[in-house]
Design a protein with these regions (language model features):
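Juxtamembrane low-complexity tails/linkers enriched in Ser/Thr-Pro and polybasic
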Residues: 1-2
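Low-complexity, disordered linker/stalk regions enriched in Pro/Thr/Ser/Gly
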Residues: 5-12, 17-220
Protein backbone atom coordinates (compact mmCIF):
# COMPACT_ATOMS: atom_id res chain seq x y z
CA UNK A 1 0.00 0.00 0.00
CA UNK A 2 2.82 2.38 0.97
CA UNK A 3 4.62 1.47 -2.25
CA UNK A 4 1.53 2.34 -4.31
CA UNK A 5 1.28 5.73 -2.58
CA UNK A 6 4.96 6.36 -3.25
CA UNK A 7 4.54 5.52 -6.94
CA UNK A 8 1.49 7.78 -7.14
CA UNK A 9 3.44 10.61 -5.54
CA UNK A 10 6.29 10.18 -8.04
CA UNK A 11 3.80 10.16 -10.93
CA UNK A 12 2.24 13.41 -9.70
CA UNK A 13 5.68 15.04 -9.43
CA UNK A 14 6.54 13.94 -13.00
CA UNK A 15 3.26 15.36 -14.33
CA UNK A 16 3.88 18.67 -12.55
CA UNK A 17 7.39 18.85 -14.03
CA UNK A 18 6.03 18.23 -17.53
CA UNK A 19 3.42 20.97 -17.10
CA UNK A 20 6.02 23.46 -15.83
CA UNK A 21 8.43 22.59 -18.65
CA UNK A 22 5.68 22.98 -21.25
CA UNK A 23 4.82 26.38 -19.80
CA UNK A 24 8.42 27.50 -20.02
CA UNK A 25 8.75 26.30 -23.60
CA UNK A 26 5.62 27.97 -24.89
CA UNK A 27 5.71 31.19 -22.89
CA UNK A 28 9.40 31.94 -22.57
CA UNK A 29 11.77 33.71 -24.94
CA UNK A 30 12.74 30.47 -26.73
CA UNK A 31 9.17 29.75 -27.81
CA UNK A 32 9.48 31.27 -31.26
CA UNK A 33 12.72 29.42 -31.93
CA UNK A 34 11.16 26.12 -30.90
CA UNK A 35 8.02 26.67 -32.95
CA UNK A 36 10.18 27.76 -35.87
CA UNK A 37 12.24 24.58 -35.77
CA UNK A 38 9.07 22.49 -35.65
CA UNK A 39 7.67 24.27 -38.70
CA UNK A 40 10.77 24.32 -40.88
CA UNK A 41 11.60 27.95 -40.22
CA UNK A 42 15.02 29.56 -39.99
CA UNK A 43 16.52 32.20 -37.73
CA UNK A 44 15.17 35.70 -37.13
CA UNK A 45 17.31 38.75 -36.36
CA UNK A 46 15.05 39.74 -33.44
CA UNK A 47 16.83 37.66 -30.82
CA UNK A 48 15.85 39.97 -27.94
CA UNK A 49 12.20 40.49 -28.89
CA UNK A 50 9.56 39.74 -26.30
CA UNK A 51 7.21 36.84 -26.78
CA UNK A 52 4.45 37.88 -29.17
CA UNK A 53 6.31 40.84 -30.71
CA UNK A 54 7.37 38.90 -33.80
CA UNK A 55 5.05 38.50 -36.79
CA UNK A 56 4.15 34.92 -37.62
CA UNK A 57 4.00 33.18 -41.00
CA UNK A 58 0.87 31.14 -40.28
CA UNK A 59 0.55 29.27 -43.54
CA UNK A 60 2.28 28.92 -46.90
CA UNK A 61 0.56 27.05 -49.72
CA UNK A 62 2.90 25.93 -52.50
CA UNK A 63 0.83 24.87 -55.52
CA UNK A 64 3.59 22.52 -56.70
CA UNK A 65 3.84 20.62 -53.43
CA UNK A 66 7.61 21.20 -53.70
CA UNK A 67 7.94 18.67 -56.54
CA UNK A 68 9.11 19.24 -60.11
CA UNK A 69 6.33 20.63 -62.34
CA UNK A 70 6.01 22.08 -65.84
CA UNK A 71 3.50 24.78 -64.87
CA UNK A 72 3.51 28.12 -63.06
CA UNK A 73 3.92 27.83 -59.28
CA UNK A 74 1.75 29.95 -56.98
CA UNK A 75 2.80 30.67 -53.41
CA UNK A 76 -0.02 31.86 -51.13
CA UNK A 77 1.10 33.30 -47.79
CA UNK A 78 -0.83 34.18 -44.63
CA UNK A 79 0.91 36.17 -41.90
CA UNK A 80 -0.27 37.83 -38.71
CA UNK A 81 1.05 40.04 -35.91
CA UNK A 82 -0.14 41.95 -32.84
CA UNK A 83 1.12 45.02 -34.72
CA UNK A 84 0.27 46.00 -38.30
CA UNK A 85 2.27 44.10 -40.91
CA UNK A 86 4.05 46.47 -43.30
CA UNK A 87 5.53 43.98 -45.75
CA UNK A 88 6.05 40.35 -46.69
CA UNK A 89 9.24 39.62 -48.60
CA UNK A 90 10.92 36.73 -50.39
CA UNK A 91 14.53 35.80 -50.99
CA UNK A 92 16.58 33.02 -52.55
CA UNK A 93 19.67 33.57 -50.39
CA UNK A 94 18.49 35.14 -47.09
CA UNK A 95 20.44 38.28 -48.06
CA UNK A 96 18.60 39.96 -50.91
CA UNK A 97 14.90 40.48 -50.17
CA UNK A 98 12.09 41.66 -52.44
CA UNK A 99 8.71 42.93 -51.22
CA UNK A 100 5.64 41.01 -52.41
CA UNK A 101 2.81 43.17 -53.77
CA UNK A 102 -0.27 43.16 -51.56
CA UNK A 103 -2.47 45.02 -49.09
CA UNK A 104 -0.60 45.78 -45.88
CA UNK A 105 -0.90 47.82 -42.66
CA UNK A 106 -3.27 45.30 -41.09
CA UNK A 107 -2.64 42.67 -38.44
CA UNK A 108 -3.48 39.80 -40.78
CA UNK A 109 -2.37 39.72 -44.41
CA UNK A 110 -2.69 37.37 -47.36
CA UNK A 111 -0.37 37.77 -50.33
CA UNK A 112 0.34 35.75 -53.46
CA UNK A 113 3.50 35.17 -55.43
CA UNK A 114 3.68 33.45 -58.84
CA UNK A 115 6.79 32.01 -60.51
CA UNK A 116 6.72 31.23 -64.23
CA UNK A 117 10.32 30.63 -65.31
CA UNK A 118 12.39 27.46 -65.13
CA UNK A 119 14.13 27.18 -61.77
CA UNK A 120 15.23 24.86 -59.00
CA UNK A 121 15.64 27.03 -55.92
CA UNK A 122 14.94 27.30 -52.20
CA UNK A 123 12.55 30.16 -51.45
CA UNK A 124 12.52 32.04 -48.14
CA UNK A 125 9.61 34.18 -46.94
CA UNK A 126 9.43 36.62 -44.02
CA UNK A 127 7.05 39.26 -42.64
CA UNK A 128 7.87 42.59 -40.98
CA UNK A 129 5.57 44.62 -38.72
CA UNK A 130 5.36 48.34 -37.98
CA UNK A 131 7.70 47.97 -35.00
CA UNK A 132 10.39 46.61 -37.29
CA UNK A 133 10.18 43.08 -35.92
CA UNK A 134 10.61 40.29 -38.46
CA UNK A 135 9.17 36.80 -38.50
CA UNK A 136 11.24 33.69 -38.80
CA UNK A 137 11.98 33.02 -42.47
CA UNK A 138 9.76 30.27 -43.86
CA UNK A 139 11.45 27.89 -46.31
CA UNK A 140 9.94 26.12 -49.32
CA UNK A 141 11.14 24.83 -52.71
CA UNK A 142 10.38 25.96 -56.26
CA UNK A 143 11.10 23.46 -59.05
CA UNK A 144 9.86 24.43 -62.51
CA UNK A 145 10.85 22.86 -65.84
CA UNK A 146 8.88 23.98 -68.89
CA UNK A 147 11.62 23.17 -71.39
CA UNK A 148 10.86 20.21 -73.65
CA UNK A 149 13.49 17.49 -74.14
CA UNK A 150 15.30 17.18 -77.46
CA UNK A 151 15.29 14.07 -79.62
CA UNK A 152 17.44 13.02 -82.59
CA UNK A 153 17.00 9.80 -84.56
CA UNK A 154 19.38 8.05 -86.91
CA UNK A 155 18.97 5.01 -89.15
CA UNK A 156 21.47 2.18 -89.59
CA UNK A 157 20.29 -0.75 -91.68
CA UNK A 158 17.14 -1.99 -89.91
CA UNK A 159 17.84 -0.30 -86.58
CA UNK A 160 16.93 3.17 -85.38
CA UNK A 161 19.16 4.98 -82.91
CA UNK A 162 17.39 7.48 -80.68
CA UNK A 163 19.27 10.13 -78.72
CA UNK A 164 17.33 12.25 -76.24
CA UNK A 165 18.48 14.92 -73.82
CA UNK A 166 16.90 17.18 -71.21
CA UNK A 167 17.87 19.84 -68.66
CA UNK A 168 16.61 17.57 -65.88
CA UNK A 169 15.93 13.96 -66.84
CA UNK A 170 14.43 12.06 -69.77
CA UNK A 171 11.96 9.57 -68.30
CA UNK A 172 10.69 7.76 -71.40
CA UNK A 173 10.91 7.35 -75.16
CA UNK A 174 7.48 6.91 -76.72
CA UNK A 175 6.55 5.41 -80.08
CA UNK A 176 3.29 5.37 -82.03
CA UNK A 177 1.89 4.46 -85.43
CA UNK A 178 -0.88 7.09 -85.41
CA UNK A 179 0.29 9.94 -83.09
CA UNK A 180 -2.65 9.12 -80.82
CA UNK A 181 -1.76 5.94 -78.97
CA UNK A 182 1.73 5.92 -77.50
CA UNK A 183 3.80 3.11 -76.01
CA UNK A 184 6.55 3.79 -73.46
CA UNK A 185 10.15 2.70 -73.34
CA UNK A 186 11.30 3.61 -69.85
CA UNK A 187 14.66 5.36 -69.60
CA UNK A 188 16.34 7.64 -67.08
CA UNK A 189 19.03 10.26 -67.49
CA UNK A 190 19.91 13.73 -68.70
CA UNK A 191 21.14 12.14 -71.94
CA UNK A 192 19.98 8.72 -73.15
CA UNK A 193 20.64 6.66 -76.26
CA UNK A 194 18.76 3.54 -77.33
CA UNK A 195 18.83 1.43 -80.47
CA UNK A 196 15.74 -0.47 -81.56
CA UNK A 197 14.04 -1.76 -84.68
CA UNK A 198 10.98 0.27 -85.71
CA UNK A 199 8.80 0.01 -88.79
CA UNK A 200 8.99 2.78 -91.34
CA UNK A 201 6.45 5.49 -90.50
CA UNK A 202 6.71 4.97 -86.73
CA UNK A 203 6.57 8.21 -84.75
CA UNK A 204 8.95 8.84 -81.86
CA UNK A 205 9.11 11.39 -79.06
CA UNK A 206 10.78 11.91 -75.67
CA UNK A 207 9.16 12.80 -72.35
CA UNK A 208 10.99 14.31 -69.38
CA UNK A 209 10.42 13.91 -65.64
CA UNK A 210 8.31 17.08 -65.51
CA UNK A 211 5.97 15.83 -68.25
CA UNK A 212 7.32 17.97 -71.09
CA UNK A 213 7.18 16.34 -74.53
CA UNK A 214 9.68 16.75 -77.35
CA UNK A 215 8.92 17.33 -81.01
CA UNK A 216 7.79 14.23 -82.88
CA UNK A 217 10.23 12.47 -85.21
CA UNK A 218 9.26 9.95 -87.91
CA UNK A 219 11.22 6.85 -88.83
CA UNK A 220 11.98 7.07 -92.56
Amino acid sequence: MKKDKKNLFILIIVIICIIVLSYLLFFSGITNKLKASLNGLTASINENANQGDLPIINNVINSSGEVLVNTDVAIIINASSIYNITKVEYSFDLKNWKKIDGSYNTKNVNVKLVFKDDMDKILYIRATNEKGYQSYAYKTAIKIDKTAPKIIIGKYKNDTTIKASDLNKVSSIQYSSDKLNWEDINVSGGEVTITKTFDKGTYLRAVDSAGNISKIKEVK
